[in-house]
Amino acid sequence: FIVSMILLYAASTVYHTFDISEHVNKILRKIDHMMIFILIAGTYTPVCLIVLGNKSGYRMLSLVWGIAIVGIIINALWINCPKWFSSVIYIAMGWVCIMAIRQIVAALTPAAFTWLLAGGIIYTIGGVIYALKLPIFNSKHKNFGSHEIFHLFVMGGSACHFVVMYSLL
């Protein structure tokens, strides 16, 4: 989980910090978007192996990492993949856990489950904001819009899931 979080935030920081050339920026954006798949799968890994820890956990882990690999390939090959399409995949991938919700609820403490659910909801709201480019601000707010709001939700979701992972130690 931590490795996937570091990879995502490192890729995002590099992409959002440096403006080298249009070609390099396009590559960095692709890597940034690919790392979202890695973070989602990285978040699932301890849930599947520690919380579920059975055949359904291994199946879910295989499914999620399979989706991550396919998503990475799609992002690598589809040059102008629409934001809404990527967002739908990210959100759907994030909610695959619904298939084992009873087991997850039974295995986690109520507090850990609440943090897990809160993180998922926060990420989902951020994904919807990103996909729909909401809210639409007037020209007064040129440097703060849906993309920046999305990143605030991503940090909130990451913080919630960090609490869950810490509780599993």
How would you describe each model-predicted region?
Residues F1-L169:
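Multi-pass alpha-helical transmembrane bundles in non-GPCR membrane proteins
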